[in-house]
């Protein structure tokens, strides 16, 4: 009887922990979306948070995990949203692309530093992702043609300058930042689920006794 009672106690904790882990994931994704000005691609990155480890009867712990490299600014809100090529750069592209990382911040023009890095602009990569990059002023790149075999832009010295990705917080960093905000709610949720499971065990025990 005591052994069965012990196994039942372990099982109810296991269930409560796994349910809480799933709820924690939902809360973290929602909080990150509320804080960060991610676009559709950025929101998909946030949802890559998964439950890698589930609680079992031998290990009462669960683990959430995400494997993502650092995002570029193209995963956050920016205007315009399309990249411009060839003559469209002169005809349609604005003087500066604007972007923001936090929803609480205003859109900022990506003007560059005027010395080492050019203003920011959008480039469509072979994967189809539209990323935010800058040119390293005065540098020389060996990649002189585009993915489609077209000549790349050259500076006044005839050099094709190297492109540098404009970095921004990774999905991992964003989730780490929002965790302290959701932790109290997750703790309370776990307590409620443990109480719920306990009440179910008690109810079943009473039912068996008649």
Describe each model-derived feature in a short phrase:
Residues 9-32, 36, 178, 182-198:
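Long, contiguous amphipathic alpha-helices that act as assembly "spine/axial" helices in icosahedral shell
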Residues 30-62:
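Translation machinery proteins
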């Amino acid at each position: 009887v005591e052994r069965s009672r012990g196994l039942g106690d372990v099982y109810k904790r296991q269930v409560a922990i796994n349910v809480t882990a799933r709820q924690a994931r939902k809360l973290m994704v929602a909080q990150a979306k509320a804080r960060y000005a991610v676009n559709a691609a950025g929101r998909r990155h946030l949802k890559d948070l998964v439950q890698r480890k589930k609680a079992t009867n031998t290990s009462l712990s669960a683990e959430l995990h995400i494997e993502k490299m650092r995002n570029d600014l193209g995963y956050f809100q920016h205007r315009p949203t399309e990249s411009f090529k060839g003559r469209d750069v002169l005809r349609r592209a604005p003087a500066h692309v604007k972007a923001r990382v936090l929803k609480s911040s205003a859109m900022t023009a990506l003007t560059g530093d005027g010395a080492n890095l050019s203003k920011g602009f959008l480039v469509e990569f072979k994967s189809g992702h539209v990323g935010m990059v800058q040119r390293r002023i005065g540098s020389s790149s060996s990649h002189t043609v585009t993915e489609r075999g077209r000549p790349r832009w050259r500076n006044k010295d005839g050099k094709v300058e190297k492109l540098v990705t404009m970095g921004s917080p990774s999905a991992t960093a964003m989730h780490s930042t929002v965790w302290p905000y959701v932790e109290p709610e997750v703790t309370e949720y776990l307590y409620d689920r443990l109480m719920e499971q306990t009440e179910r065990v008690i109810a079943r025990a009473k039912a068996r006794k008649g």
